[in-house]
Amino acid sequence: MTDLPFVTADLPGSGGALRRAPEDFRVDEVPAYLPSGAGPHLYLRVEKRGRTTRDALRELARALGVPERDAGAAGLKDKDAVTTQWLSFPVARDPDPAALAAPGLRVLEVSRHQNKLRTGHVRANRFTLAVRGGDLARARDCAAALAARGLPNFFGPQRFGAAGRNAAVGRALVTGERSPEAGRAARDRFLRRLSLSAYQSLLFNRWLAERMADGRFAAALAGDVMKKLDTGGLFTCEDPATDGPRVERFEISPAGPMFGHALRLAGGEAGAREARLLEAEGIALADFVRGGGEAEGTRRAARLRIDVALEPLEDGYRAAFELPRGAYATVVMRELTKADAELPEED
């Protein structure tokens, strides 16, 4: 992410080291809904240390006597952290939580619900991170600036794969360029979707970086597709003088392009900016039909409200904050520390 701008570029970072131990990085999943307490699906809220979500699903499905494919999770969490989340299983009986305990895995709550948990059934993630050797006073200045200016909703480096290879393969799929990696991705639906998504994310980051460089990060442009931050609804900006103050109040945000063949188009000045980005890439929206037509296109908020709580540690500080699904803690910590680090986030 070294080529991306900071919204707090005028402030020095705290420095410090992230993630020296799993306990230094905690992620608590905030579900889209809570289990009702009744229904055919057993819901378990679990805490994991040094285990991935798939590890936990496999272990618990085996203990409960159900196929792993029938287990459900709203999101995948990395093993190099302490994480909590709900998992679901089609089990009629209520088990003893203690009997399900395993190394690095314990059950915190048991409930039931009518449906299986599925990918995306999550509202947000709550992060708690220790920054060893970080300067708390500097972190506080950066956190205050973020609260006032907003968080640029960049994709983190996890999205792009080692050395950005996933995005490069995605571009090859869109342009029709032939390569062994693109050939493999074209035949494998998982790799194809991963690569196309990485390329869409790369273009979004470029769009947002240009917007920040032009001083339009917290502004509404004529023709912008805008996103309501409370409901996710989209509309087109017709009067920047009316919508601009709403952007400043974090009611709405410009919604940047995740380019695809069926993308909702921006108009006016905003549409012209997006068209120039595509032209510079040498592609058109119709090119995204390649690769199976799965890259339909969508819109992503450019700017998020962020409230970072800080507290001192003997050797640094602890930062806690909540982000909506799809936003990256890496981006927050980069603003606070002014250092690039890849955190073990869901992706």
From Swiss-Prot:
Domain of life where this protein originates: Bacteria
Instruction: State which Enzyme Commission number(s) the record gives.
Output: 5.4.99.27
Sorted alphabetically, which InterPro entries does this protein's record hold?
PsdUridine_synth_cat_dom_sf, PsdUridine_synth_TruD, PsdUridine_synth_TruD_CS, PsdUridine_synth_TruD_insert, TruD_catalytic, TruD_insert_sf, TruD_pseudoU_synthase
- Pull one GO CC term from this UniProt entry: cytosol
SUPFAM superfamilies in alphabetical order: Pseudouridine synthase (SSF55120)
Answer whether the UniProt record assigns the keyword Protein biosynthesis to this protein. no
Named from the GO MF annotations, one term is: tRNA pseudouridine(13) synthase activity
> What is stated as this protein's family in its record?
Belongs to the pseudouridine synthase TruD family.
Q: What does this protein do?
A: Responsible for synthesis of pseudouridine from uracil-13 in transfer RNAs.
This chain's protein is named tRNA pseudouridine synthase D
Origin species, per record, is: Anaeromyxobacter dehalogenans (strain 2CP-C)
Primary gene name: truD
